[in-house]
């Protein structure tokens, strides 16, 4: 979606070091055991500013992206443990004044946490049951420059950890809070940009066909995983050089549901579902982040809530093909994480 020249555009680079102060909250009564947990952490970001005129024209902003590494004490060392997080982030930024910048920051990555659920040694932790889990975060950032190359930031960020339904129990851990840090730029950034020409946006809707695969357990205490296969037809419409809108029709064959039906002695053996969803995404070079909200139009069993949400990160291999990872959830509980292959039809 973005020109490949984005990868070689003139860049300003820098790093930041920050502290995180957050508080976990219980989404349901069954997650009340985390009440009072206050995860605290340290964070290192390495980033680039995409400040070429072409990218500014496309975004109508200053686009920033990078790698984030974090350490968190999750607030209950004997129950929730500690976590190491590695994520990619992107952040459209906007100048408010000579010294003041705001941005909207989205993270996607992975977390290693050391106190997973164990029926013998740690039965009380229902938030995650595998050491490696998914990490998602969304926040609003503000920056104030104290000199031409240095800025302090205060941000509000919503953090989420979940193993994506690969193993149960998996209530997930949500911990919103504040991030306070110091940012240093190797060269003085120039936020006094202007849009010299309106980028040409292709009016056509890109049409994709996607196949995906996952595997999950049938219940909270099973270790055997059952395959989930799916097919998705989607349309993508550019809003500008960074933002795009999506609409999709998805069909699923869920063998984990079929196994659950057998366990519950339900006579109707139907493992198929179909849903429609729409959402919005960000593009940065060959990497796309997208989130969508959907509803099942065919789900005869009704084991899950009718409404679901999805969060996808994908990488464009070439003009036609892309690969990605997608997290699907019902309300606060992840259903599964799938791997997917996408093909551009037009």
Protein language model regions, located:
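Transmembrane beta-strands of outer-membrane beta-barrel pores
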Residues: 21-27, 48, 69-75, 108-116, ...
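Solvent-exposed loop/turn segments connecting transmembrane beta-strands
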Residues: 35-38, 73-83, 98, 168, ...
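Repeated loop/turn-to-beta-strand initiation elements of outer-membrane beta-barrel proteins
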Residues: 53-56, 98-102, 144-152, 188-191, ...
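Transmembrane beta-strands of outer-membrane beta-barrel proteins
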Residues: 13-19, 63-67, 102-106, 152-156, ...
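Residues on the lipid-exposed face of transmembrane beta-strands in outer-membrane beta-barrel proteins
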Residues: 44-48, 88-94, 106-110, 138-144, ...
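Outer-membrane beta-barrel "beta-signal"
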Residues: 24, 44, 174-194, 334-346
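Bacterial Sec-dependent N-terminal signal peptides
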Residues: 1-18, 100, 144, 150, ...
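Residues that define the transmembrane beta-barrel architecture of outer-membrane proteins
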Residues: 13, 36-42, 61, 80-86, ...
